[in-house]
Amino acid sequence: MARLPQLKVFAEKHGLKMVLISDMIRYRRAREKMVERTAVARLPTEYGNFTCVSYKNTLDGHEHVAFLYGEHEGDVSGAVGEDMLVRVHSECLTGDIFKSARCDCGNQLDMAMRRIAGEGKGCIVYLRGQEGRGIGLGHKLRAYNLQDEGRDTVQANEDLGFPADTREYGVGAQILQDLGVTSLRLMTNNPAKYNGLSGYGLKVTGRVPLFAPVTMENKRYIDTKRMKMGHLFEMLEGVEPSQAESEQKPSR
């Protein structure tokens, strides 16, 4: 099978257009409905009662879930509405479930749930199949080994043959649209997530940073996200999560 450089030469020689499979997937996600709602249930948590809505991606079969907080009595159509507090969270088994100290993912999820409960209304979209910024669990563990050898989180992904971040947010945007979102305040430190959701027709009216505690284990990871990936971090070591949450208007 010809590889990309050979395909480029062939396309130029014969005057052909070349389209990557990833481009086709991105195009379809931007223009076709790729999610279908499969179930709705009440989910009591330590932060209060959420309504859990499951979705299936009809393109790749991945299941995703949205957690709604507020008074909608089981009817989630239009439950979110305008200018709502929203977190789009990529699955992180090691951080979310096993509380890995290598990253800040689990802390950010906890902070988002607590903040939504405190505000009284909001939504978390939990995107599965995005482990390790999209490279998968096995590759993420291999990246951990490379980090222990001295690479940072970006270098480790690249050494394994991946970009720094392979995620895209079309499915998350479609889930929010299905729930009736028209505008939102996005809980994120990642400008790519802000731009990604805006590119799918959602109006992001504000950015709410989530500053998790910086520790010996995650400091290099957070520094790399800030310096190489443009993530916005403004807290210092020792600041408690409850002290580190504030809201900003996005500058564009």
Could you describe each region identified by the protein language model?
Residues 1-252:
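Catalytic domains of riboflavin
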